[in-house]
Protein backbone atom coordinates (compact mmCIF):
# COMPACT_ATOMS: atom_id res chain seq x y z
CA UNK A 1 0.00 0.00 0.00
CA UNK A 2 1.25 3.44 -0.95
CA UNK A 3 -0.90 5.82 1.08
CA UNK A 4 -3.83 6.47 3.41
CA UNK A 5 -6.48 9.21 3.23
CA UNK A 6 -8.34 9.89 6.47
CA UNK A 7 -11.53 11.92 6.49
CA UNK A 8 -13.37 12.85 9.69
CA UNK A 9 -17.00 13.99 9.67
CA UNK A 10 -18.62 16.17 12.30
CA UNK A 11 -22.36 16.56 11.89
CA UNK A 12 -24.86 17.53 14.58
CA UNK A 13 -28.47 17.44 13.37
CA UNK A 14 -31.39 19.71 14.09
CA UNK A 15 -33.68 17.14 15.71
CA UNK A 16 -37.38 17.35 14.93
CA UNK A 17 -39.82 17.73 17.80
CA UNK A 18 -42.50 15.25 18.65
CA UNK A 19 -45.14 17.30 16.97
CA UNK A 20 -48.70 17.65 18.23
CA UNK A 21 -50.76 19.80 15.82
CA UNK A 22 -52.56 22.60 17.63
CA UNK A 23 -55.89 23.97 16.49
CA UNK A 24 -55.24 25.15 12.95
CA UNK A 25 -51.71 25.39 11.56
CA UNK A 26 -48.67 26.92 13.21
CA UNK A 27 -46.58 29.92 12.32
CA UNK A 28 -43.49 28.50 10.59
CA UNK A 29 -40.60 29.03 13.00
CA UNK A 30 -37.59 26.88 13.80
CA UNK A 31 -38.83 26.60 17.40
CA UNK A 32 -42.16 25.24 16.12
CA UNK A 33 -40.64 22.18 14.48
CA UNK A 34 -37.20 21.56 16.00
CA UNK A 35 -36.21 20.47 19.51
CA UNK A 36 -33.90 23.35 20.35
CA UNK A 37 -33.23 22.22 23.91
CA UNK A 38 -31.99 18.82 22.72
CA UNK A 39 -29.99 20.42 19.89
CA UNK A 40 -28.24 22.78 22.31
CA UNK A 41 -27.55 19.99 24.81
CA UNK A 42 -25.99 17.80 22.12
CA UNK A 43 -23.83 20.70 20.96
CA UNK A 44 -22.62 21.43 24.48
CA UNK A 45 -21.73 17.78 24.98
CA UNK A 46 -19.71 17.68 21.76
CA UNK A 47 -18.12 21.09 22.35
CA UNK A 48 -16.72 19.90 25.67
CA UNK A 49 -14.52 17.35 23.87
CA UNK A 50 -13.52 19.30 20.76
CA UNK A 51 -10.57 21.28 22.13
CA UNK A 52 -8.87 18.18 23.54
CA UNK A 53 -9.59 16.09 20.43
CA UNK A 54 -8.27 18.76 18.08
CA UNK A 55 -5.06 19.02 20.12
CA UNK A 56 -4.61 15.28 19.57
CA UNK A 57 -5.18 15.71 15.82
CA UNK A 58 -2.61 18.52 15.84
CA UNK A 59 -0.04 16.20 17.45
CA UNK A 60 -0.91 13.56 14.87
CA UNK A 61 -0.32 16.09 12.08
CA UNK A 62 3.02 17.08 13.62
CA UNK A 63 3.94 13.39 13.35
CA UNK A 64 3.12 13.35 9.63
CA UNK A 65 -0.65 12.89 9.40
CA UNK A 66 -3.01 14.60 6.99
CA UNK A 67 -6.74 14.94 7.55
CA UNK A 68 -9.80 16.01 5.60
CA UNK A 69 -12.59 17.43 7.75
CA UNK A 70 -16.24 17.37 6.73
CA UNK A 71 -18.06 19.84 8.98
CA UNK A 72 -21.78 19.97 8.20
CA UNK A 73 -23.59 23.26 7.75
CA UNK A 74 -25.94 22.40 10.60
CA UNK A 75 -22.94 21.98 12.92
CA UNK A 76 -21.41 25.24 11.69
CA UNK A 77 -24.71 27.01 12.40
CA UNK A 78 -24.61 25.70 15.97
CA UNK A 79 -21.05 26.96 16.45
CA UNK A 80 -22.51 30.46 16.86
CA UNK A 81 -23.32 29.33 20.41
CA UNK A 82 -19.63 28.97 21.28
CA UNK A 83 -17.00 30.75 19.12
CA UNK A 84 -14.23 28.79 20.86
CA UNK A 85 -15.27 25.73 18.89
CA UNK A 86 -14.62 27.39 15.54
CA UNK A 87 -11.35 28.82 16.84
CA UNK A 88 -10.22 25.30 17.70
CA UNK A 89 -10.82 24.20 14.10
CA UNK A 90 -9.08 27.34 12.81
CA UNK A 91 -6.03 26.37 14.85
CA UNK A 92 -6.19 22.92 13.29
CA UNK A 93 -6.41 24.46 9.82
CA UNK A 94 -3.32 26.55 10.56
CA UNK A 95 -1.23 23.37 10.74
CA UNK A 96 -1.29 23.37 6.94
CA UNK A 97 -2.10 19.69 6.54
CA UNK A 98 -5.86 19.81 6.95
CA UNK A 99 -8.33 20.04 4.09
CA UNK A 100 -12.03 20.84 4.39
CA UNK A 101 -14.58 18.94 2.33
CA UNK A 102 -17.66 20.41 0.70
CA UNK A 103 -21.08 18.85 1.20
CA UNK A 104 -24.74 19.77 0.97
CA UNK A 105 -25.12 22.54 3.53
CA UNK A 106 -28.05 20.99 5.36
CA UNK A 107 -26.72 17.41 5.26
CA UNK A 108 -29.49 16.72 2.77
CA UNK A 109 -30.29 14.11 0.14
CA UNK A 110 -30.86 16.80 -2.49
CA UNK A 111 -28.54 14.89 -4.84
CA UNK A 112 -31.51 12.56 -5.37
CA UNK A 113 -33.86 15.26 -6.68
CA UNK A 114 -34.47 15.12 -10.45
CA UNK A 115 -33.77 18.86 -10.58
CA UNK A 116 -30.31 19.47 -9.08
CA UNK A 117 -30.76 23.23 -8.64
CA UNK A 118 -31.19 23.00 -4.87
CA UNK A 119 -28.32 20.51 -4.61
CA UNK A 120 -26.01 22.90 -6.44
CA UNK A 121 -27.08 25.84 -4.28
CA UNK A 122 -26.52 23.91 -1.05
CA UNK A 123 -23.05 22.74 -2.08
CA UNK A 124 -22.07 26.25 -3.14
CA UNK A 125 -23.42 27.69 0.13
CA UNK A 126 -21.35 25.18 2.09
CA UNK A 127 -18.23 25.97 0.06
CA UNK A 128 -18.71 29.69 0.69
CA UNK A 129 -19.17 29.09 4.43
CA UNK A 130 -15.97 27.03 4.64
CA UNK A 131 -14.09 29.73 2.75
CA UNK A 132 -15.50 32.46 5.00
CA UNK A 133 -14.67 30.64 8.25
CA UNK A 134 -11.35 28.99 7.43
CA UNK A 135 -9.95 30.84 4.43
CA UNK A 136 -9.76 27.75 2.21
CA UNK A 137 -11.74 26.60 -0.81
CA UNK A 138 -12.77 22.91 -0.70
CA UNK A 139 -11.75 20.66 -3.58
CA UNK A 140 -13.17 17.38 -2.22
CA UNK A 141 -16.90 16.63 -2.05
CA UNK A 142 -18.64 14.27 0.37
CA UNK A 143 -22.37 13.61 0.13
CA UNK A 144 -24.22 12.96 3.41
CA UNK A 145 -24.20 9.27 4.33
CA UNK A 146 -21.43 8.88 1.72
CA UNK A 147 -24.21 8.78 -0.86
CA UNK A 148 -23.31 8.41 -4.50
CA UNK A 149 -25.69 8.83 -7.40
CA UNK A 150 -24.57 8.93 -11.00
CA UNK A 151 -25.86 12.34 -12.06
CA UNK A 152 -23.91 14.74 -9.84
CA UNK A 153 -20.36 14.60 -11.25
CA UNK A 154 -20.95 17.31 -13.83
CA UNK A 155 -22.43 19.68 -11.24
CA UNK A 156 -19.50 19.13 -8.89
CA UNK A 157 -16.94 19.86 -11.59
CA UNK A 158 -18.74 23.09 -12.54
CA UNK A 159 -18.43 24.16 -8.90
CA UNK A 160 -14.67 23.63 -9.06
CA UNK A 161 -14.58 20.40 -7.06
CA UNK A 162 -12.01 17.87 -8.23
CA UNK A 163 -12.87 14.63 -6.40
CA UNK A 164 -15.33 12.99 -4.04
CA UNK A 165 -15.46 10.38 -1.29
CA UNK A 166 -18.24 7.77 -1.30
CA UNK A 167 -19.16 4.48 0.35
CA UNK A 168 -17.16 1.41 -0.67
CA UNK A 169 -20.35 -0.54 -1.27
CA UNK A 170 -20.35 -3.99 -2.81
CA UNK A 171 -22.76 -3.01 -5.61
CA UNK A 172 -20.21 -0.41 -6.73
CA UNK A 173 -17.08 -2.48 -6.38
CA UNK A 174 -18.28 -5.97 -7.35
CA UNK A 175 -15.04 -7.96 -6.99
CA UNK A 176 -12.74 -4.92 -6.74
CA UNK A 177 -11.25 -3.59 -3.51
CA UNK A 178 -11.50 0.08 -2.42
CA UNK A 179 -7.78 0.70 -2.83
CA UNK A 180 -7.61 2.93 -5.91
CA UNK A 181 -8.69 6.30 -7.22
CA UNK A 182 -11.77 5.35 -9.19
CA UNK A 183 -13.21 7.46 -11.95
CA UNK A 184 -16.19 8.01 -14.15
CA UNK A 185 -17.41 11.63 -14.23
CA UNK A 186 -15.23 12.70 -11.29
CA UNK A 187 -12.33 10.97 -9.47
CA UNK A 188 -13.73 9.10 -6.47
CA UNK A 189 -12.23 7.53 -3.36
CA UNK A 190 -14.31 4.78 -1.75
CA UNK A 191 -14.38 4.20 1.99
CA UNK A 192 -12.70 1.01 3.19
CA UNK A 193 -15.57 -0.15 5.38
CA UNK A 194 -13.80 -2.75 7.53
CA UNK A 195 -10.72 -0.70 8.36
CA UNK A 196 -12.78 2.44 9.03
CA UNK A 197 -15.03 0.59 11.45
CA UNK A 198 -12.09 -1.13 13.14
CA UNK A 199 -11.28 2.37 14.39
CA UNK A 200 -14.70 3.95 14.83
CA UNK A 201 -16.78 1.00 16.05
CA UNK A 202 -14.58 -1.85 17.28
CA UNK A 203 -11.70 0.05 18.86
CA UNK A 204 -13.10 0.00 22.41
CA UNK A 205 -14.79 -3.43 22.15
CA UNK A 206 -12.85 -5.58 24.61
CA UNK A 207 -14.49 -8.75 23.25
CA UNK A 208 -13.05 -8.07 19.78
CA UNK A 209 -10.28 -10.52 18.89
CA UNK A 210 -7.96 -7.68 17.85
CA UNK A 211 -8.45 -5.59 20.99
CA UNK A 212 -6.42 -3.59 21.90
CA UNK A 213 -5.80 -2.01 18.51
CA UNK A 214 -2.44 -0.26 18.36
CA UNK A 215 -1.17 1.97 15.58
CA UNK A 216 1.60 -0.52 14.82
CA UNK A 217 -0.84 -3.41 14.44
CA UNK A 218 -3.17 -1.37 12.25
CA UNK A 219 -0.30 -0.15 10.06
CA UNK A 220 0.89 -3.73 9.60
CA UNK A 221 -2.54 -4.71 8.24
CA UNK A 222 -2.42 -1.85 5.74
CA UNK A 223 1.14 -2.73 4.73
CA UNK A 224 0.03 -6.14 3.49
CA UNK A 225 -2.81 -4.82 1.31
CA UNK A 226 -1.93 -4.24 -2.33
CA UNK A 227 -3.08 -0.98 -3.89
CA UNK A 228 -2.57 2.77 -4.16
CA UNK A 229 -4.65 4.34 -1.42
CA UNK A 230 -6.90 3.29 1.45
CA UNK A 231 -9.62 5.74 2.42
CA UNK A 232 -10.67 5.82 6.07
CA UNK A 233 -13.84 7.71 6.97
CA UNK A 234 -14.69 8.26 10.64
CA UNK A 235 -17.30 10.09 12.66
CA UNK A 236 -15.57 12.77 14.73
CA UNK A 237 -17.58 11.82 17.79
CA UNK A 238 -16.18 8.28 17.73
CA UNK A 239 -12.73 9.63 18.66
CA UNK A 240 -13.54 11.05 22.14
CA UNK A 241 -16.16 8.31 22.65
CA UNK A 242 -13.66 5.48 22.16
CA UNK A 243 -11.11 7.31 24.30
CA UNK A 244 -13.61 7.57 27.15
CA UNK A 245 -14.75 3.94 26.81
CA UNK A 246 -11.42 2.13 26.83
CA UNK A 247 -8.59 4.65 26.39
CA UNK A 248 -5.87 4.42 23.79
CA UNK A 249 -7.63 6.19 20.92
CA UNK A 250 -5.74 9.46 21.33
CA UNK A 251 -2.41 7.66 21.45
CA UNK A 252 -3.41 5.59 18.43
CA UNK A 253 -3.98 8.72 16.33
CA UNK A 254 -0.72 10.30 17.48
CA UNK A 255 1.25 7.15 16.64
CA UNK A 256 -0.46 6.14 13.39
CA UNK A 257 1.46 8.41 10.97
CA UNK A 258 4.76 7.28 12.48
CA UNK A 259 3.83 3.59 12.24
CA UNK A 260 2.75 4.06 8.62
CA UNK A 261 5.89 6.01 7.76
CA UNK A 262 8.06 3.16 9.09
CA UNK A 263 6.44 1.00 6.42
CA UNK A 264 6.83 3.54 3.62
CA UNK A 265 3.14 4.55 3.68
CA UNK A 266 2.20 8.24 3.64
CA UNK A 267 -0.94 9.97 4.88
CA UNK A 268 -2.24 12.27 2.16
CA UNK A 269 -5.33 14.29 1.27
CA UNK A 270 -7.79 13.25 -1.47
CA UNK A 271 -6.69 16.08 -3.76
CA UNK A 272 -3.13 14.74 -3.51
CA UNK A 273 -4.24 11.16 -4.22
CA UNK A 274 -5.95 12.04 -7.49
CA UNK A 275 -2.76 13.73 -8.71
CA UNK A 276 -0.47 10.90 -7.63
CA UNK A 277 -2.29 7.79 -8.81
CA UNK A 278 -3.68 6.56 -12.09
CA UNK A 279 -7.47 6.46 -12.18
CA UNK A 280 -9.26 3.13 -12.42
CA UNK A 281 -12.50 3.34 -14.41
CA UNK A 282 -15.55 2.18 -12.47
CA UNK A 283 -18.71 2.31 -14.58
CA UNK A 284 -21.01 1.56 -11.64
CA UNK A 285 -20.35 5.04 -10.24
CA UNK A 286 -22.66 6.31 -12.98
CA UNK A 287 -25.26 3.53 -12.91
CA UNK A 288 -25.62 2.61 -9.22
CA UNK A 289 -26.54 4.39 -6.00
CA UNK A 290 -24.96 3.55 -2.67
CA UNK A 291 -24.86 4.94 0.87
CA UNK A 292 -23.24 4.17 4.17
CA UNK A 293 -25.06 1.20 5.76
CA UNK A 294 -27.16 0.76 2.61
CA UNK A 295 -29.73 2.70 0.61
CA UNK A 296 -32.52 0.82 2.39
CA UNK A 297 -31.75 2.75 5.57
CA UNK A 298 -32.58 5.99 3.79
CA UNK A 299 -35.20 4.95 1.25
CA UNK A 300 -36.31 1.48 2.24
CA UNK A 301 -40.02 2.13 2.79
CA UNK A 302 -42.95 4.08 1.41
CA UNK A 303 -42.87 6.81 4.06
CA UNK A 304 -39.24 7.66 3.27
CA UNK A 305 -39.94 7.81 -0.47
CA UNK A 306 -43.05 9.93 0.12
CA UNK A 307 -41.15 12.31 2.39
CA UNK A 308 -38.45 12.74 -0.28
CA UNK A 309 -41.03 13.47 -2.97
CA UNK A 310 -42.84 15.98 -0.77
CA UNK A 311 -39.54 17.71 -0.01
CA UNK A 312 -38.80 18.01 -3.71
CA UNK A 313 -42.19 19.66 -4.26
CA UNK A 314 -41.82 21.98 -1.25
CA UNK A 315 -38.38 23.16 -2.38
CA UNK A 316 -39.84 24.07 -5.77
CA UNK A 317 -42.93 25.73 -4.26
CA UNK A 318 -40.86 27.86 -1.91
CA UNK A 319 -38.48 28.89 -4.71
CA UNK A 320 -41.48 30.02 -6.76
CA UNK A 321 -42.70 32.27 -3.93
CA UNK A 322 -40.21 35.14 -4.02
CA UNK A 323 -42.03 36.79 -1.14
CA UNK A 324 -41.20 33.76 1.03
CA UNK A 325 -37.98 32.38 -0.47
CA UNK A 326 -36.05 35.47 0.65
CA UNK A 327 -37.19 34.92 4.24
CA UNK A 328 -34.15 33.59 6.13
CA UNK A 329 -36.22 31.62 8.64
CA UNK A 330 -38.22 29.86 5.92
CA UNK A 331 -35.03 28.97 4.02
CA UNK A 332 -33.46 27.47 7.13
CA UNK A 333 -36.58 25.47 7.96
CA UNK A 334 -36.81 23.91 4.51
CA UNK A 335 -33.08 23.21 4.71
CA UNK A 336 -33.23 21.52 8.10
CA UNK A 337 -36.25 19.48 6.99
CA UNK A 338 -34.00 17.87 4.35
CA UNK A 339 -31.46 16.35 6.77
CA UNK A 340 -30.55 12.73 6.10
CA UNK A 341 -31.08 11.99 9.81
CA UNK A 342 -34.82 12.45 9.32
CA UNK A 343 -34.87 9.67 6.73
CA UNK A 344 -32.82 7.37 8.95
CA UNK A 345 -35.25 7.97 11.83
CA UNK A 346 -38.11 6.70 9.63
CA UNK A 347 -36.36 3.39 8.96
CA UNK A 348 -38.79 0.76 10.24
CA UNK A 349 -35.87 -1.30 11.52
CA UNK A 350 -35.97 1.26 14.35
CA UNK A 351 -38.54 0.58 17.05
CA UNK A 352 -40.03 4.08 16.60
CA UNK A 353 -39.76 4.14 12.80
CA UNK A 354 -43.53 4.20 12.15
CA UNK A 355 -44.17 6.85 14.81
CA UNK A 356 -41.35 8.99 13.45
CA UNK A 357 -42.79 8.73 9.94
CA UNK A 358 -46.20 9.99 11.07
CA UNK A 359 -44.57 12.75 13.12
CA UNK A 360 -42.19 13.92 10.41
CA UNK A 361 -44.82 13.92 7.68
CA UNK A 362 -47.14 15.93 9.94
CA UNK A 363 -44.46 18.60 10.31
CA UNK A 364 -43.90 18.61 6.57
CA UNK A 365 -47.63 19.02 5.99
CA UNK A 366 -47.80 21.95 8.39
CA UNK A 367 -44.88 23.70 6.71
CA UNK A 368 -46.29 23.15 3.23
CA UNK A 369 -49.60 24.68 4.28
CA UNK A 370 -47.65 27.71 5.54
CA UNK A 371 -46.21 28.16 2.04
CA UNK A 372 -49.64 27.90 0.44
CA UNK A 373 -51.10 30.46 2.83
CA UNK A 374 -48.07 32.76 2.67
CA UNK A 375 -47.60 32.59 6.45
CA UNK A 376 -44.26 33.85 7.84
Please state what every model-predicted region is:
Residues 1-104:
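N-terminal catalytic cores of secreted or lumenal carbohydrate-active enzymes
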Residues 2-48, 178-186, 190-191, 205, ...:
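Active-site and substrate-binding clefts of carbohydrate-active enzymes
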Residues 8-13, 72-74, 103-108, 143-149, ...:
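An acidic- and aromatic-residue-enriched active-site/binding cleft used to recognize and process polar
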Residues 46-67, 91-97, 129-136, 224-225, ...:
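A structural motif corresponding to the C-terminal end of an alpha-helix
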Residues 52-55, 80-93, 172-183, 213-221:
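Alpha-helical scaffolding within the catalytic cores
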Residues 53-57, 86-90, 120-130, 153, ...:
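Generic structural signal for well-ordered alpha-helices
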Residues 67, 73-145, 187-202, 236, ...:
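Metal-dependent polysaccharide deacetylase catalytic core of the NodB/CE4 family, i.e.
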Residues 115, 121-176, 239-256:
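Catalytic domains of cell-wall/extracellular-matrix polysaccharide-remodeling enzymes
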Amino acid sequence: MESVCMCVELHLPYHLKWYWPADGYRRPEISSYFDQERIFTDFQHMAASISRTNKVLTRSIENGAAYTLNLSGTFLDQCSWDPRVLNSFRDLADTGNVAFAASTYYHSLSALYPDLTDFKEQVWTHMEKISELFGVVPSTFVNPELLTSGNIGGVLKKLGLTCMIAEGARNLLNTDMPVSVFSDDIPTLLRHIDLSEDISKRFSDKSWDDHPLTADKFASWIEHIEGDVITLYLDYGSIPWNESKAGGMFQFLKDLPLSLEERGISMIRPEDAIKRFEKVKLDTLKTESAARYGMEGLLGNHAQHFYLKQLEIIVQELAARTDLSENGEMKKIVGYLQQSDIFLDMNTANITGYEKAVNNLSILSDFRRAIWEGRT
